Amino acid sequence: MSTLPLLPDSPGGGVLAYRYGRAVSRDEFLHEVLALADRLPKAAHVLNMCMDRYWFAVGFFAAISRGIVSVLPNSPAPEHIASLCAGTPSLFCLSDQELPPSNQVPYLRIGQSTAHLSSGNADLPQIPFDQCIARLFTSGSTGEPQAHSKTFGRMQLGANAEAERMWSAAKGPCTVLGTVPFRHMYGLESTVLLPILGGGRLCTRTPFFPADIASALAELPAPRFLVTTPFHLRKLLDADIEIPTLAAILSATAPLSRELASSAEARLGAPMMEIYGSTETGQIATRRPSSQLEWETYSGIKLHQERDETIATGGHLECARVL
């Protein structure tokens, strides 16, 4: 069985994340992950409800190292969480909040660094390519939310493909700030896996309001990469406030008009990219709406038509998917 390292190599254990202005090295992150992995209960599934992106990532990779599947709900609504807890065997909840999101399952709270207690070099776990690491859910806009399982190897391939495309647009790896939820496929891929598995740097914040986005960007060193939505982007441009220099901007979740993309590029001075993807497929194509009408698929992704359906195959996809 083929395996992959839990984290890609980083000469000298370079910076992997920023937490409220403080740089966190790859080695420190790895120590956090392995320390938490030792504390995790014996279980098959974890409901990762951390609100801080850094602690979410620590919990996510700790679970991977223990062979535990992260269950990532598409909504924090109590009824949705209750349904997941009732329907998922061998489940516990992980969060950085004082009160547990649910009293139906065991709860483990995290959020206090233990990396300073570690010494020496930590052994890097090797993860089976086909190990299931996450279960994500569709939005339910066309019916009941559907669960989709993801494996480590396929998500690594997807992160590599996104890194190739995005770092090309940005002219090099960046620190990634996201305004989007990281338990959804877009946010997980672009604000957690792209920086950690794709050679960038993760930012712990998830700002919503324009002033908060500008403040969070100002905490980060250049080059900066903003992962957002058309809604957040429009509000940011309308706010008419000073925005720190960006290397590139990425949008998804709703169609990005050419007018808005062009306005963003003119105002922010950075290439404005748009992603095509879904929970089922992950992201499979991009375009630059200001100058491109057609989508450009990721390396290895092939499309073909069967009657009135478009089928995607190859690349990081485990099987053929109808778009």
Regions found by a protein language model. Give the residues of each.
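Conserved pre-ATP/AMP-binding loop-to-beta segment of ANL
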Residues: P5-G12, T114, S119-F137, A169-T175
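Conserved AMP-binding/adenylate-forming core of the ANL superfamily
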Residues: P5, S10-L40, K150-G153
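Conserved AMP-binding/adenylate-forming
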Residues: L36-P76, C174, G178-F182
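Conserved helix-loop-beta element of the AMP-binding
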Residues: L108-I110, M155, T175-L177, R224-V227, ...
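AMP-binding/adenylate-forming core of the ANL superfamily
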Residues: K302-L323
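Conserved AMP-binding/adenylation subdomain of ANL enzymes
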Residues: L157-T175, R183-F225
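Gly/Ser/Thr-rich phosphate-binding loop
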Residues: L237-L293, K302-H304
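Conserved AMP-binding A3 loop
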Residues: R22-S25, P125, D130-N160
